[in-house]
């Protein structure tokens, strides 16, 4: 009798588990598994987005991508952007977070936190439009200031040698506040007694930072680097609004390259590949 009751109870538990996991599994299949399968299927065919006729081309789309010099440049651009964005963002985030954590002026801290976090919640398109005007070669605000100071105009977005750096600086300005909050949260977990012991030993602040603070918050720094790297590989809005991949593909990144092939050149097969 007990075995039958136990068996019935186990069945109910299994059914409950299946019923609980089923909605999440269905959503995962619909929004993740199916799109991936369809992308692989679509990459084997040629044809435009508006045409129902598709021609099977096998691996030709993959060959076109692999031998496309623009694709190679796009990969290099994406890696350069990721390294610059993650590096600058993390250095600034750590410096600002350590300064705010050590400062005793609460009102100033609150004001600084609000100022650096506000750009993060603003639409990326809005930020891109504003900076596109600020960096405009002839009538942009930044170049107007440089001209007023008797300096030459700076080609922020109009030169292949400066466009990528300008784009990185805009993205760092927008995103650094979020990473500052993450690093500050990690700094709050460091026991104050460790710093007190370091002060009693007259340990220099720089040595305290590198020997105590940095190792204690290293897991959070690693996490933020991963998050920032993922975000940098997904950049699209700023490129689309500010540069459209130019000049001369100097800011063309992976996501924008895929978008351009699918919607500008009308070749979704290559985009899926």
Give each language-model segment a name.
Residues 1-11:
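Short, Lys/Arg-rich, polar N-terminal cytosolic tail immediately upstream
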Residues 9-273:
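A structural signal for multi-pass alpha-helical bundles of membrane permease subunits
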């Amino acid at each position: 009798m007990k075995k039958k009751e136990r068996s019935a109870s186990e069945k109910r538990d299994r059914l409950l588990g299946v019923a609980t996991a089923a909605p999440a599994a269905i959503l995962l299949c619909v929004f993740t598994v199916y799109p991936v399968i369809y992308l692989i299927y679509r990459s084997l065919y040629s044809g435009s987005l508006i045409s129902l006729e598709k021609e099977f081309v096998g691996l030709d789309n993959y060959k076109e991508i692999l031998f496309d010099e623009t694709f190679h440049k796009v990969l290099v651009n994406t890696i350069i952007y990721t390294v610059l964005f993650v590096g600058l963002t993390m250095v600034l985030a750590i410096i600002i977070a350590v300064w705010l954590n050590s400062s005793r002026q609460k009102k100033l801290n609150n004001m600084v936190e609000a100022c650096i976090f506000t750009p993060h919640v603003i639409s990326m398109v809005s930020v891109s439009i504003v900076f596109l005007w600020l960096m405009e070669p002839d009538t942009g605000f930044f170049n107007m200031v440089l001209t007023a100071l008797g300096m030459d105009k700076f080609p922020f977005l109009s030169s292949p040698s400066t466009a990528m750096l300008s784009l990185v600086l805009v993205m760092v300005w927008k995103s650094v506040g979020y990473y500052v909050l993450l690093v500050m949260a990690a700094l709050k977990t460091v026991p104050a007694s460790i710093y007190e012991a370091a002060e009693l030993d007259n340990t220099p602040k720089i040595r305290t930072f590198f020997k105590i603070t940095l190792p204690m918050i290293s897991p959070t720094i690693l996490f933020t680097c991963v998050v920032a790297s993922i975000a940098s590989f997904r950049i699209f809005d700023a490129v689309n609004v500010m540069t459209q991949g130019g000049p001369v593909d100097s800011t063309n990144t992976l996501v924008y390259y895929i978008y351009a092939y699918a919607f500008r050149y009308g070749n979704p097969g290559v985009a899926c590949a």
